[in-house]
Every structure is written in structure tokens, then in C-alpha cells.
From Swiss-Prot:
The lineage of its organism: Bacteria, Pseudomonadati, Pseudomonadota, Betaproteobacteria, Burkholderiales. GO terms for molecular function: acetoacetate decarboxylase activity. SUPFAM superfamilies: Acetoacetate decarboxylase-like (SSF160104). Its EC number is 4.1.1.4. This is Acetoacetate decarboxylase. The active site is at 116 (schiff-base intermediate with acetoacetate). It catalyses: acetoacetate + H(+) = acetone + CO2. It holds the Pfam family ADC. InterPro entries: Acetoacetate_decarboxylase (IPR010451), Acetoacetate_decarboxylase_bac (IPR023653), ADC_dom_sf (IPR023375). It is an enzyme of class 4 (lyase). Belongs to the ADC family. Keywords: Decarboxylase, Lyase, Schiff base. Catalyzes the conversion of acetoacetate to acetone and carbon dioxide.
Length: 246
């Protein structure tokens, strides 16, 4: 294969059978359980990279069920998102994500910079409540519950919240182990069709784990819980800050 052919075909690895396809990346009936809790503000400031700024000592703990996604298939995800500001723009910084499907792990890390790791999350209705769990290996590290559809939320407001900016720290090493890419990336959810939004009483339990340290941001108080169902497109990203260029 000629170098020009390599350049024209190069998108993702392996070259002859990429781990994930080109987009657009559309999700149908994507289901969220988002439990917002208050945590230790000092710990937040230690882990959120500047120029992002922590605005409140809050964390959104998310369980997401994605049964129909373009190119990625059927999978579930769980992780922590921290409310932040960038140049006065409010958004969310994704700290870590745990999921059970290789294509979105590879695509998420290589394309956007999502901090994804392999684990075993679940999200389903358990009789009268919605239940989210996260197992890392044989250890249960997160359990979230919310009363099932106790109260409807405003669809327009929840659509607006979901459409806000999201931030990622994309890191790709060079072959010698030094940083080749170290960038702050911004992306948006697009073409959102909110099909339902509810709230109810909620609980969240996090357990310590060396390699899935969700409990490093302890739950001090549950602030809010939301159960959302939406169709949406995961938009591609843009680099807003290059750490290696500074």
C-alpha cells in the first residue's frame, strides 16, 4: 500500500477494519439516570484542570442506557460529570466513564477524548424504581436509585440543559511515552428530541476502588435526580485549549 493510500484511508485502527465507523453518531431512546450530589469542593478543585473553573461543589453521577446507537451498538455507561465554567460559559467536565462495549471506548478515547474504561454498568426499571449499578471487575462501586416517574419535568428546560457544552481532557501519548496530544475539547449534543423527563426521590452509594475511584468524590447530600429519555446526535468536538502550546 502506498503512503498516499494510507493517508486517504486512515481514520482509526486497525487501518483495514477500524474499531468504530465514521459518524454521524445518532442515539435513539437514550435513557439517563442523573443523580446530582454535593461533594467536597477542595477535592473538585484538585482534579478539574484549568482553565476550567469549578462553580459549585456538585457532581452529576450518570447511568446511561444506549440500546440503539449508530455504529456503536447496544451498551450501557456510567460516570461522573462536574459542573464547570470555561470563559464564563457554563458546562460539564467529564471526569471518568465506565462502559461495556469496545467500539465506543475506542472511538470515544481516540476521536473526542472521552475518559472511558471497560467495566459493567446497568440501568433498568426494578418494579417501582429505576436502578443503576456499576461493577468494576467483581466489585460493586456505584448504586443509584430513583422512584420511577414520580413527577414530570419540563421538557423544554431539560432539552436546554442537555444541549449545553461539555468538556473533555484529551490525552494521547507519543511513542516514547511523552504527551503527543493534550487538549481541552468541547462538544455538544445535537438534534435533541426529548421524549420524557421525570424526577423522584433518589439515593446514591459509592464504594472505594483503586481503579474506579468514583468514591473519591464523596456523596454529602443528594441535590437532584432526573430520569430522561431522548433521541440525539453526539456532535464532533473542537479544541478550545492546547496544553502543549502554552
Amino acid at each position: 500500500m502506498k503512503p498516499s493510500d494510507v493517508r486517504s484511508k486512515a481514520f482509526a485502527m486497525p487501518l483495514t477494519s477500524p474499531a468504530f465507523p465514521m459518524g454521524p453518531y445518532r442515539f435513539v431512546d437514550r435513557e439517563f439516570l442523573i443523580i446530582t450530589y454535593r461533594t467536597d469542593p477542595d477535592r473538585l478543585r484538585e482534579i478539574v484542570p484549568e482553565p476550567l473553573q469549578v462553580t459549585e461543589p456538585l457532581v452529576h453521577y450518570e447511568f446511561i442506557r444506549m440500546a440503539d446507537s449508530t455504529g456503536f451498538g447496544d451498551y450501557t455507561e456510567s460516570g461522573q460529570v462536574i459542573p464547570v465554567e470555561y470563559n464564563g460559559q457554563a458546562g460539564g467536565y467529564t471526569l471518568a466513564m465506565y462502559l461495556d462495549d469496545h467500539p465506543p471506548i475506542a472511538g470515544g478515547r481516540e476521536l473526542w477524548g472521552f475518559p472511558k474504561k471497560l467495566a459493567s454498568p446497568t440501568l433498568h426499571v426494578n418494579t417501582d424504581h429505576i436502578l443503576g449499578t456499576l461493577d468494576y471487575g467483581k466489585v460493586r462501586v456505584a448504586t443509584g436509585t430513583m422512584g420511577y416517574k414520580h413527577k414530570e419535568l419540563d421538557i423544554d428546560e431539560q432539552t436546554k440543559r442537555l444541549a449545553g457544552p461539555n468538556f473533555l481532557l484529551k490525552i494521547i501519548p507519543h511513542v516514547d511515552g511523552t504527551a503527543r496530544v493534550c487538549e481541552l475539547v468541547r462538544y455538544y449534543m445535537q438534534d435533541i428530541k426529548m421524549k420524557g423527563a421525570w424526577t423522584g426521590p433518589a439515593s446514591l452509594e459509592l464504594a472505594p476502588h483503586a481503579l474506579a475511584p468514583v468514591a473519591d468524590l464523596p456523596v454529602l447530600e443528594i441535590v437532584e435526580a432526573r430520569h430522561l429519555v431522548a433521541d440525539l446526535t453526539l456532535g464532533l468536538g473542537e479544541v478550545v485549549y492546547d496544553y502543549l502550546a502554552q
